[in-house]
Amino acid sequence: MAKEELIEMQGKVDEILPDSRFRVTLDNGHILVAYTGGKMRKNHIRILAGDKVTVEMSPYDLAKGRIIFRHIEASSSRPFKPAKRFAR
């Protein structure tokens, strides 16, 4: 499938599910299950319930998607705290 065929939508994470999946409600009200994209997983980007995200979906299955971006809100109530790194 070509990358041009994918649909990008904005949404909000409602619930964190097992196996690094998330229940996301899109701006149009549609609910789907999404997983984090590879680059987000590689860079250890954390997604919490209530975060605004961009979801990429296939036009053939609109019930599943991939989270490709987490939007940072300027007036966020939770401060940014980097993850602790332990020497191995």
Swiss-Prot record:
Cellular component terms per the entry's GO annotation: cytosol
Residues annotated as domain S1-like: 1-72
Record carries keyword Oxidoreductase: no
An example Gene Ontology molecular-function term: ribosome binding
Keyword Cytoplasm: yes
Keyword field: Cytoplasm, Initiation factor, Protein biosynthesis, RNA-binding, rRNA-binding
Location relative to the cell: Cytoplasm
Origin superkingdom: Bacteria
PROSITE patterns: S1_IF1_TYPE (PS50832)
NCBIfam families reported in the protein's UniProt record: infA
Annotated family: Belongs to the IF-1 family.
Protein purpose: One of the essential components for the initiation of protein synthesis. Stabilizes the binding of IF-2 and IF-3 on the 30S subunit to which N-formylmethionyl-tRNA(fMet) subsequently binds. Helps modulate mRNA selection, yielding the 30S pre-initiation complex (PIC). Upon addition of the 50S ribosomal subunit IF-1, IF-2 and IF-3 are released leaving the mature 70S translation initiation complex.
Annotated PANTHER family: TRANSLATION INITIATION FACTOR IF-1, CHLOROPLASTIC (PTHR33370:SF1)
Quaternary state and interactors: Component of the 30S ribosomal translation pre-initiation complex which assembles on the 30S ribosome in the order IF-2 and IF-3, IF-1 and N-formylmethionyl-tRNA(fMet); mRNA recruitment can occur at any time during PIC assembly.
Name this polypeptide is given: Translation initiation factor IF-1 2
Organism: Methylobacillus flagellatus (strain ATCC 51484 / DSM 6875 / VKM B-1610 / KT)
Lineage: Bacteria, Pseudomonadati, Pseudomonadota, Betaproteobacteria, Nitrosomonadales
Protein encoded by which gene: infA2
